[in-house]
C-alpha cells in the first residue's frame, strides 16, 4: 500500500539499531537474537495494513501485550528464560522504533488505542518522504554504531 507506511527497510534499520541498544548491556553472544527480534518487532505493527492501519497494532497496549506474548510463547516452546527475555526485549525495541518512525509522519499513530482514537504525531513529512525515511535510516545506523563501539571498547 503505497503512501501508507515508511519503507520497510527504514523500519528494519531503525528497529535493529534500537534493539541493539539494549545489547550494549548484554554479552556479545546474544547479538543475533537482538537483530532477529528487532527485525520482527519492527515489521509486526504493519500486519494491520489491510484492517485499521495505524490503529489496531500501532499503540502502546499492543506493544506491551505482543512483546510479553512473544516471551511467553518462546518459553512455552521450550526456549530458555534468557533467550526468551532477550528476544522479547529486542522485539519490544523493534516494535517501539516502528511506532516512533510512524509518529513522524503526517498521519501519526493511535498510541492510546483502544482508550482513545486520537492520532499522535510529530509531523515532519509523509510516510513516503525522503526526510522521514532518511531519519529512520540515520538513527538506526547511529544506534548500530554506538553498539559496535561499545563492544570494541569492552
What are these regions, as identified by a protein language model?
Residues 1-154:
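N-terminal membrane-targeting hydrophobic helices
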